Amino acid sequence: MEENLYCLRKGTRLIGRYTIEGVLGQGGFGITYLGIDELHEKKVAIKEFFPQGIVTRNIEYQDTVTVTFVGEKDNYEKGKERFLKEARTMAKFSKDEGIVKALDFFEINNTAYIVMEYLEGITLKQYLRENQRIAPEDLIELLVPLIESLDEIHSQGMIHRDISPDNIMVLPDGRIKLMDFGAARDYTEFGEKSLSIVLKPGYAPPEQYQTHGIQGP
């Protein structure tokens, strides 16, 4: 993927341990890099909190992220805390083989980073595009591990809230992994209170379409 002036350069080191090798992907709220964990000598994926339109950076001069407008500073800090909360949520399920592992997380460069296991494979969205139709028995075999992982997540009082083909990774050996816990919430924390609306049309349950829909397993 083509890099730009706000993506960290190849060779950049973070906390003296992780080296940036390139950009894997970019979204509205962050940049994901291919990195090397120098301590364990293995590839990792490094997700950087970088909400476009709120922050900027020119890597020709510095690696530090700058909030574009003073009035956005509070929103940026709240967003960064939610990002770190995502890391803590993922870390709770590091022993579950059906969930992408969060290996480390930290703050530096006036932003935050999540270090995750690096996975070779494609998203379920890409898989479905390439394979088009999947036999029911094959689909069940594919999804049972995901359902078991969701059962574990729910048993800990959490809901993912963003289950969709683009948040599920299919590995070369056929195993799948659930990704992206940015919308996850502890439903026991809210009791009968409603949660914010987060959904993907066609995949979200009916209660997520409602402002006061009670969410939970």
Predicted feature locations:
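Protein kinase catalytic-loop region centered on the HRD/HxD motif
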Residues: 146-158
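AlphaC helix of the protein kinase catalytic domain
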Residues: 124-134
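Conserved activation segment of eukaryotic-like protein kinases, specifically the C-terminal portion
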Residues: 194-208
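Conserved short submotifs of the Hanks-type protein kinase catalytic core
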Residues: 109-123
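Activation segment signature within eukaryotic-like protein kinase domains
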Residues: 142-143
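AlphaC helix of the eukaryotic protein kinase fold
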Residues: 60-92
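Activation-segment/catalytic-loop signature of the eukaryotic protein kinase fold
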Residues: 105
